[in-house]
């Protein structure tokens, strides 16, 4: 049942295969630039001693935006993890609200700035309470999916986690229960190949996280997590399947982590400069920009304008 071939798409096929139009793709790009700009600024503020600990989303943006875009804002539920800055933006949180968490300012809506930045809950946007304890939110997502089923709602629940979390017992118990009861939940693994400093080869003996789905009787899809259209397509397929009552799906999005695990980590101790330079070749920002240019939806002037607007929004935040 596992579909372990890595999925990717081209600009020429995006409209026919996914239903996305140029307007949607450009809106995705704006969100991606805003997220990258904000992430870079937060990282800089941390280095200046002004912002709390940061788990950067750089390299993960396409996986986060593409998956969130495929679901229904305000209706479906999101159990995300500490690196999912872009999802917060897609769902409607403002840069001011998010920045207030990193700067411990009054008015931060997730937790009143009392938790790790980006942690807490925003029920109006379908964001359910985040925990910094790895993988504990995954069984909670399954419980929410069960509740939706019992209440005869067509809610789909998606839970995001990293490759390190995919080896935790909580995740496997959650996948087994969800598959047995055919619950409307999507397990979305953002695989950046490192559990803090532990490489994928030391985490699991199988070739992919997606291949584990077969053991639980659900589809497993491996997708290029730097290709936002491919991610959107895979998540849409999983959401449709869940809504029809066909049960859960495990999606493994292969992404890159451009910075240390967090601002408290030193990744030069376990990653070479050559490896980091190679990962930069799969920049989701550049990939989407190139796709937009191929279909004449992005000019140099418009690109400059989008970057300028993002910097202005972040400056004001």
What do these predicted ranges mean?
Residues 127-316:
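Glycine-rich ThDP/TPP pyrophosphate-binding loop and its adjacent helix/strand module
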Residues 25-27, 71-73, 113, 244-246:
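A generic structural signal for short, non-catalytic loop/turn and secondary-structure boundary residues
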Residues 37-40, 44-181, 199-205, 210, ...:
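Cofactor-binding active-site loop characterized by glycine-rich and histidine/acidic residues
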């Amino acid at each position: 049942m596992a579909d372990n071939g890595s999925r990717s798409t081209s600009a020429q096929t995006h409209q026919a295969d996914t239903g996305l139009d140029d307007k949607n793709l450009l809106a995705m790009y704006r969100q991606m630039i805003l997220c990258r700009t904000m992430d870079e600024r937060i990282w800089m503020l941390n280095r200046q001693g002004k912002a709390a600990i940061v788990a950067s989303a750089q390299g993960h943006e396409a996986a986060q935006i593409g998956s969130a875009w495929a679901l229904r804002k305000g209706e479906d539920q999101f159990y995300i993890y500490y690196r999912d800055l872009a999802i917060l933006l897609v769902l409607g949180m403002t840069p001011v609200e998010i920045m207030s968490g990193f700067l411990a300012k009054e008015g931060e809506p997730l937790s009143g700035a009392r938790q790790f930045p980006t942690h807490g809950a925003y029920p109006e946007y379908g964001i359910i309470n985040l925990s910094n304890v790895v993988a504990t939110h995954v069984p909670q997502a399954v419980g929410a999916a069960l509740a939706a089923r019992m209440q005869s709602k067509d809610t789909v629940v998606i839970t995001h986690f990293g490759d390190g979390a995919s080896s935790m017992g909580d995740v496997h118990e959650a996948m087994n229960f969800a598959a047995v009861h055919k619950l409307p939940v999507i397990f979305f693994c953002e695989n950046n190949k490192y559990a803090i400093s532990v490489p994928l080869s030391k985490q699991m003996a199988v070739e992919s996280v997606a291949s584990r789905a077969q053991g639980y009787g659900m589809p497993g899809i491996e997708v290029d997590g730097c290709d936002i259209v491919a991610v959107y397509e895979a998540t849409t397929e999983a959401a449709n399947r869940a809504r029809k009552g066909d049960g859960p799906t495990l999606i493994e999005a292969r992404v890159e982590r451009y910075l240390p695990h967090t601002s408290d980590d030193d990744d030069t101790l376990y990653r070479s400069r050559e490896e980091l330079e190679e990962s930069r070749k799969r920049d989701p920002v550049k990939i989407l920009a190139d796709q937009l240019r191929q279909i004449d939806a992005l000019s140099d002037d418009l690109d400059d304008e989008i970057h300028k607007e993002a910097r202005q929004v972040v400056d004001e935040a």
